[in-house]
Amino acid sequence: MLKKLSVTLSLLLITVGLLAACNSQPAAAPQPSQPEADTAPAEEAETKTEADTASAEEAESETAASPGGDLEVFSYWTSGGEAAALDALFSTYKDEYPNTNIINAVIAGGAGSNAFAVLQTRLAGGDPPDVWQTHPGAELYGRYVDPGYAAPVTDLYQQEGWLDKMPKQLVESMTAEDGEIYAVMVGIHRGNDLWYNKKLLAEHGLEIGDTLSFDQFIQMADTLKEANIPALCVGDSGIWASAMILENNLISALGSRYPGLWDGSVSFEDPAVKEAIEQYGQMLEYQNEDHAALSWDQAAKKLIEGGCAFTVMGDWAYGEFVNANLKDNEDFGWIDFPGTQDYFDLVADGFTLAKDAPNPEAAKAWMKSVNSLPAQEAFNPLKGSICARTDCDRKKFGIYHNWSMDSFASDTVVPSIIGGAAAPADWQQAYFDGVTQFVVDKDVDALAQSLAQAAQDAGISQ
């Protein structure tokens, strides 16, 4: 059952101080029986040597206790920004557990479009990786918990004190009906962002304020079209990228009623749904001609190079911008997707532990490591997401991240079908299939009807 998220971030800062001082005075002339002043330095040196030895033995013991063998980490983080962020998790883990050999089992394809099929085949065949990338909500339950592939990690939350350091509603989205928690989240993405090339817009006399309406976007798109510049960068070789534009239009058109699409309280034949589809179709009139040949990150690269002006994408796109050495709010800008300024479209990333993990000790150590403060403060600035923990230091994050943190704290959080939280896998695929057909025929009524049928087939229609 979908768990609705509406959360508030609190930020805790930790300060550590270290003090050390040591001094002694030399003795006068030696006497037959040495005075106490002479023996103090020797005793101190002996104590220091014993302490150093104990420290070395402790470090050696910790290294020996580090889990060994291979640890297979399955994910679909392959773009430049994603790979850099994943490497940060690997580095943090290796610092803590140097005896483990990490196998980076990565499958290319945004939003897990290819990875899901590979992973499901392996899980069904009894050949699981130790840990795999996952999203909370419907995806976690339907794909992994209900079939019995996932192991609970509730004990880690209790032992490490994580329940006090994670948004309650986020934890609930990882908690199954048996009361067990089945995932660890490493970052929280915002899916309703509209990114733009600031310099390109400035060259054409276009300026964006604090908000942008749909009509204002269309006006800018027309201005760019006159200059033979595609307004919208799209890379839908994986159709989910185009489906995300529709998702944002649905949030814009339905507002607070949007989550009702996924629990059956709002019909896909609602007039607001058709309005959203019409706006989606209108936006596609301004997309780049080579959209079907590009992946989402290639579309982001096209924006970076000035080949088009805007892209609708979750803030994993931020990772591509900084990986290309672009500067926040100088080379690129961002704004709420038109009409969604009071909402946070949540796409959370994390990992699930295999029930029959080949190396359970190393796998559990991975789950512990990725939810540590050092790991999340290293991973999220590169990935574009904000910490899943509530105690990360805001000073370690840039302008965009702090903007996103504020949005997460104050706006209404809604589930994403692209991010796996809103609907089961079959429903998600039907949504993608409907979008695929719409990109070809632009038939508003047909798409609305196909989505309504998909909801009925999933048992969540009115």
Question: Could you say what each language-model-derived stretch is?
Answer:
Residues 91, 95-96, 101, 125, ...:
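Extracytoplasmic/periplasmic substrate-recognition and gating elements
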Residues 177-186, 192, 218-265, 308:
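Extracytoplasmic/periplasmic solute-binding protein
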Residues 220-223, 263-293:
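Glycine-centered hinge/linker elements that transmit conformational signals in sensory
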Residues 92-173, 203-205, 309-310:
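Extracytoplasmic "Venus flytrap"/periplasmic binding protein-like
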Residues 43-52, 57, 148, 202, ...:
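Conserved C-terminal helix/tail region of periplasmic/extracytoplasmic solute-binding proteins
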Residues 76, 90, 139, 243, ...:
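Extracytoplasmic/periplasmic substrate-binding proteins
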Residues 77-80, 84, 92, 148-158, ...:
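Mature extracytoplasmic/periplasmic domains
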Residues 58, 65, 135-191, 218, ...:
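Hinge/lid segment of periplasmic solute-binding proteins
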